[in-house]
Amino acid sequence: FSKNKEIWRPNLLPRSEDMNARYKNPDNDPRGVWKPADFSVKTYSAANDFPIKTPSGRIVTPPKSRCRVTSEDQFRELVSENRIWFGETGNNVPSVKKFLSEVKDGSVSMTIWLYQDVGHNQDAKKEVKDFNETEVFGTPKPEKLMQRIITLATNENDIILDSFLGSGTTAAVAHKMGRRYIGIEMGEHAVTHCVPRLRKVIEGDQGGISEAVGWKGGGGFRFYRLGEPV
């Protein structure tokens, strides 16, 4: 939910080591590591449909129904700037060099989130057992999932509201990430799960995302009973 969907933009996610590892420097370019990107696009333009002669002498044309990313003049400029790669033998289809030093500090979130990145329910249940081994909570969320959501949607010191706090995952992750938070829970797990979980967080709990965010403990929270459940 956003107050204004026209102006809200999600934050970028931190770049992972795997993402950066895709950048190499086979030609020892002084601008640093780079990766090749397709030099053709689907949005066809006759002005950008031109043959290219590779350094080896081979003539290559764009794939069917596609054209070059730039005009021929712009392509020549890229060649003069050593931004076009024809492979180590000079015989490959041209690609444009994308330098790591020129990309954004983060990455745009994909619409599909894999369990390797955001965890799964088994992770969440293990996290709950760390502070309550006797009372099972049926549907906990993994801390990595909430970390992804909070990273995309908020900034440090923002206020996060979870009106169905459950096992306290949102509050625990918000605390570790330097956000303020309000959690509402009518069930008894407010006492059996949320309170002990937050106490462990304050004590420096190293479960969940703690290592990833460098959590060492600290802070505090207030617990209120506002009335009998309706």
Stretch-by-stretch model annotation:
Residues 1-2, 116, 161-166, 184, ...:
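Generic beta-strand/beta-sheet core signal
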Residues 2-159, 191:
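Class I S-adenosyl-L-methionine
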Residues 17, 92-101, 166, 215-226:
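A glycine-rich phosphate-binding loop feature that marks nucleotide/adenosyl-phosphate handling sites
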Residues 23, 97, 101, 196, ...:
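Charge-rich, low-complexity amphipathic helices
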Residues 47-49, 110, 160, 167-170, ...:
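Active-site lining segments that contact anionic ligands and/or coordinate catalytic metals
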Residues 139-211:
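Conserved S-adenosyl-L-methionine
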Residues 199-229:
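S-adenosyl-L-methionine
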